């Protein structure tokens, strides 16, 4: 017997690691997460570690960059351009975008595409609305759920009776 444990309030996808995300009406969830999620990232060219990706913890401005799809889209429905915080639209694999981000970061970067995505910990991130509300209560703020960069924002939980 299926038991309802909650509802999905929102689905988010972040095509480029640490850049602005997009809200989806629906998505395809597979072994490697949500299709199109975190499939692109800037690689720090001077970093040979096992995690060379440029993230918002190193460059908070990345969160203000907005990946956008062209009319035709691309294979795997990936973005074709990025709108900078100043409003400039640049090709996602163009040298201008890499130079702009590298200048802000202070070191060269290059855009990379990975088949299975670039995840810090898990290929899908879920957060409950109750968790966000409790964090807000404790911090005396109303945080935007996107601050936590979830793929799924889960709503209420129902106590299920089994027969």
Write out the residue ranges for each language-model feature.
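Electropositive, beta-rich accessory/interaction domains or terminal extensions
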Residues: 1-163
């Amino acid at each position: 017997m299926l038991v309802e444990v909650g509802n999905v309030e929102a689905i988010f996808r972040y095509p480029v690691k640490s850049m602005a995300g997009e809200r989806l009406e629906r998505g395809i969830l597979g072994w490697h997460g949500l299709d199109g999620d975190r499939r692109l990232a800037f690689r720090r060219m001077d970093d040979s570690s096992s995690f060379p990706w440029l993230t918002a913890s190193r460059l908070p401005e990345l969160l203000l960059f907005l990946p956008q799809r062209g009319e035709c889209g691309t294979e795997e429905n990936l973005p074709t351009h990025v709108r900078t915080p100043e409003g400039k639209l640049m090709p996602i694999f163009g040298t201008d975008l890499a130079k702009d981000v590298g200048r802000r970061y202070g070191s060269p970067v290059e855009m990379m595409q990975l088949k299975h995505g670039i995840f810090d910990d898990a290929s899908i991130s879920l957060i409950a609305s109750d968790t966000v509300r409790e964090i807000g209560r404790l911090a005396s703020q109303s945080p935007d759920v996107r601050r936590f960069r979830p793929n799924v924002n889960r709503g209420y939980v129902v106590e299920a009776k089994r027969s």
